[in-house]
């Protein structure tokens, strides 16, 4: 069936994602960081010189950590090998947007940076900090041959391309321990009611669900995955646009539905402990050598972290796997994704070389081969991915009837995931959220753009 593209707020139809399985992928959420939108894993700054080259050196600033960072370093090493440009690489996983803004304001921007959310992309493009892709030696009009149209739109502001899609991950992946499910005599649930029944059965075998809500963006992903399935795609599109109304009853209804699973009864250690727990520690509660729970919700990037960092002895299909986020309400076959875009903040020759390298199939195949991401480049086929978990992730996006960008990342800079996530932290702790106040702040942020 032919599916059409709608794009009032970085919205994607699966027709443009077919390349993920028949020759390429599409762009996502990455995993964000403890206290900053878009960042990867909890922890401080990292990075340092990665490569040196005869042509000179560029400065690259990233928000990634763990397996995502290691994958990116392989891309940087390949860039040096192919172009002769060295890379001074820096990463800040906790205060990334503040660090990047300070560098820009101080007149010392990195040559290349990962942009922490679409709100920041709009800000940096409009204030002139980001350079147009067309000014970096790339004919932007030809890129539709290599990327699904919607993913290019993710880096576009007022009709001009400022950033390139780097990678994406499906946010509709529910991760679990097959051995725990088997021991509890449960199967992967398909509906929300079945999901709650599974939690009830496994709550003491050894525990139902792990949660790392210290990184509050994890809660925004929960909200978005339920909202789009319960309220529907049109309501989702509106909520995460400047026309959104956070006092609409559908918002609190989604929170109430979320609390049916995210509560003291089912979250290992209880909600108070979960609010103080990093999301990577929650992954370890499920996929460590001695599991404390059977289920963990987050995007496709979890597999690379669990296998690459948490427990290299995991076996796909035996001790790690995923199934689609359960259906909620009447909306079926929809999902969300998160993605990162890369932009240039200088027009140096090295920055131009990196942007030109990044759009090549080779660069994207190096990235895909690590298993940390799904590439949006059409030149990347499923044979580029290292395991079945990532192949199925790409296929799931290709098959979805409708797919939407991570909603919190569409909100204006300064609101994005942090204020939304903080509101949801209060909600799971049993406190009433003042959505009218949140609506006032969101509207003011939209009006200020």
Predicted regions and their residues:
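Conserved C-terminal helix/tail region of periplasmic/extracytoplasmic solute-binding proteins
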Residues: 182, 398-449
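Extracytoplasmic/periplasmic substrate-recognition and gating elements
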Residues: 309-373
